[in-house]
């Protein structure tokens, strides 16, 4: 079994893991990102909205598909409430695959290491370091690190392993991308109401080239 040593190990190579690796590797630390999937940015994880401040921080404007000025909120009684100002940028719609890959690539270029097809299997916290076992492409590795960061999302291995609590409420969501929807340019739409999305809302988000992302979240 191979043994590796790093200053920081980050579980999850999404935007948060990628950004953390960029900042830490930029300080001269030896950083490893561990990603369970074979491809960064897949499977698709969210609706792909990124605020201007977050985009400015990572500077990957080439991943932007649409600019959005605001939201048209449809109430259950038929009311329509616009939130935002025409011509004033409120958020970006990005290609999540390209966005994730670009942010993670920044970490790699800063000196971080990236392991895909890799999952942590065991961990032990010792006084001087964290001892981690990782299965990578079927091969087991021992890793010593001074710091372990969990950036592994809603089903976090890190949270479960360290018994950091459980979500108070579970929700279920579905999203698809469609062609032919006639929406208002530079505005997304939100629909609330128990008949449409009990406990949360549905959305329509322009995603470029005449397409829209239509999805719903509701209580499980």
Describe each region flagged by the PLM.
Residues 43-46, 162-163:
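Short, solvent-exposed loop/turn segments at secondary-structure boundaries
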Residues 13, 23, 27, 106-220:
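Predominantly flavin-linked oxidoreductase catalytic cores and closely associated redox partners
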Residues 2-16:
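Beta1/beta-strand and adjacent pyrophosphate-binding region of the FAD-binding site
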Residues 9, 22-44:
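Glycine-rich FAD pyrophosphate-binding loop
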Residues 11-12, 36, 95, 116:
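A secondary-structure boundary/capping signal
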Residues 51-104, 117:
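A conserved beta-strand/loop capping segment in the N-terminal third of enzymes
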Residues 49-52, 167:
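Short, hinge-like loop/turn segments at secondary-structure boundaries
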């Amino acid at each position: 079994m191979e043994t590796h040593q790093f200053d920081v190990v980050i579980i999850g190579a999404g935007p948060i893991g990628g950004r953390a690796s960029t900042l830490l590797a930029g300080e001269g630390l030896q950083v490893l990102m561990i990603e369970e999937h074979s491809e960064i940015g897949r499977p698709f994880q969210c609706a792909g909205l990124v605020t201007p401040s977050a985009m400015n921080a990572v500077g990957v404007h080439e991943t932007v598909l649409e600019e959005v000025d605001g939201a048209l909120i449809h109430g259950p009684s038929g009311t329509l409430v616009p939130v935002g100002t025409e011509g004033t940028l409120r958020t970006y719609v990005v290609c999540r695959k390209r966005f994730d890959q670009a942010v993670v690539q920044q970490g790699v270029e800063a000196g971080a290491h990236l392991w895909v097809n890799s999952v942590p299997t065991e961990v032990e916290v010792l006084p001087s370091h964290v001892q981690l076992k990782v299965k990578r492409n079927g091969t087991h590795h021992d890793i010593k690190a001074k710091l372990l960061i969990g950036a592994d999302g809603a089903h976090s291995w890190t949270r479960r392993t360290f018994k950091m609590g459980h979500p108070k409420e579970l929700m279920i969501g579905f999203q698809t991308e469609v062609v032919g929807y006639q929406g208002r340019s530079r505005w997304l739409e939100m629909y609330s109401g128990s008949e449409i999305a009990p406990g949360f809302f549905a959305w329509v988000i322009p995603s470029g080239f005449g397409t829209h992302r239509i999805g719903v979240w509701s209580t499980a």
